[in-house]
Amino acid sequence: MARIAGINIPDQKHSVIALTAIYGIGKTRSKAVLAEAGIAESVKISELSEEQIDLLREGVAKYTVEGDLRREVSMNIKRLMDLGCYRGIRHRRSLPLRGQRTKTNARTRKGPRKPIKR
């Protein structure tokens, strides 16, 4: 298995799909990295040479991925919560942020129903 950005990339998948195993790399970014490295999208990871894998490592290293990206996202959310802005308050209360209704629905974000005590 090839190891890129600290992640074991699946060998038997096409290179476009295999690169999406890295957090922060989707199909579009995967295609861009492959085009920059000059590797065909249909080639499987197991068929790549060590030099080509090194090119992929360099291409992926240009982006914020994996732990750094997760940390950046969590710090952004923490910043919103510390500011006390509307979005930060909604994060703190575990409610939807983007204007969805909450009288009904929003069960995923709010969690299971709480029984009414009489």
From Swiss-Prot:
Pfam families: Ribosomal_S13. GO terms for molecular function: rRNA binding; structural constituent of ribosome; tRNA binding. The keyword Ribonucleoprotein applies. Gene3D superfamilies: 1.10.8.50, 30s ribosomal protein s13, domain 2 (4.10.910.10). Keywords: Ribonucleoprotein, Ribosomal protein, RNA-binding, rRNA-binding, tRNA-binding. InterPro entries: Rbsml_uS13_C, Ribosomal_uS13, Ribosomal_uS13-like_H2TH, Ribosomal_uS13_bac-type, Ribosomal_uS13_CS. One of its GO terms (cellular component) is cytosol. Residues 94-118 are annotated as: Disordered. GO terms for biological process: translation. Transmembrane segments: none annotated. NCBIfam families: uS13_bact (TIGR03631). Belongs to the universal ribosomal protein uS13 family. Located at the top of the head of the 30S subunit, it contacts several helices of the 16S rRNA. In the 70S ribosome it contacts the 23S rRNA (bridge B1a) and protein L5 of the 50S subunit (bridge B1b), connecting the 2 subunits; these bridges are implicated in subunit movement. Contacts the tRNAs in the A and P-sites. PANTHER family: 30S RIBOSOMAL PROTEIN S13/40S RIBOSOMAL PROTEIN S18, SMALL RIBOSOMAL SUBUNIT PROTEIN US13M. Part of the 30S ribosomal subunit. Forms a loose heterodimer with protein S19. Forms two bridges to the 50S subunit in the 70S ribosome. This is Small ribosomal subunit protein uS13. The lineage of its organism: Bacteria, Pseudomonadati, Pseudomonadota, Gammaproteobacteria, Vibrionales. The gene is rpsM.
